[in-house]
Amino acid sequence: SGKLGADTLLIEKNGFLGGAATASVLGPISPFHYKDEQVINGIPQDFMDRMVKEAGSTGHMKTLDPYGSGDSLGFYDREKYKYVAVEMLKEFGVDILYHSMIDSVDCDNFKLTGLTTVSKGGDRLHFSAHVIVDATGDGDIAVRCGENYCIGDPVEHKFSPSSAMFEMANVDTEKVFRYIQENQEDFEF
């Protein structure tokens, strides 16, 4: 919305951007491809291009087995992800309110007109808006406005499997690759 000229405020609970992608050890950026066709472009691709330019991502790498979810993944450096995200939002004119969470919402018959944030220090700020996008990750704003929700999938209430990514230094990569080749039954490819 900021890129299109609308006054835009991003409310972020952490002191940095990226959500689970930078606050945890979440796996790679999800696929931009369906089979061999790239189906996600626009701002996400601009972000990926900037990450590659900053030496913060591998870019799109073809997967050995997409498990039905897409044929590419993009690994990334969490700190460069934070930097590129902030730089792009600044360019788009987006204001960012860090260390703040949603305290309450102004909602009448599912019409959302505003919300109040609370900062880490306890300060409360109220915002009115024509459009509010719930990007909390858990639908916090929608739930506070009375929307129905379910935990996990609606039938078995199962969650997505967790993913983890980590970095290591001083690894004997030749030895690791040799082990993988000699012990393929220990890995899913």
Residue ranges and their predicted role:
Residues 6-7, 12-104, 160:
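Conserved N-terminal/central alpha/beta ligand/cofactor-binding core
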Residues 110, 136, 159-163:
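Short, solvent-exposed loop/turn segments at the edges of secondary structure
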Residues 141-189:
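Rossmann-like dinucleotide-binding core of oxidoreductases
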Residues 109-115:
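Short, hydrophobic/aromatic-rich segments at coil-to-beta transitions
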Residues 15-17, 103-104, 122, 139-140, ...:
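Solvent-exposed loop/turn segments at secondary-structure junctions
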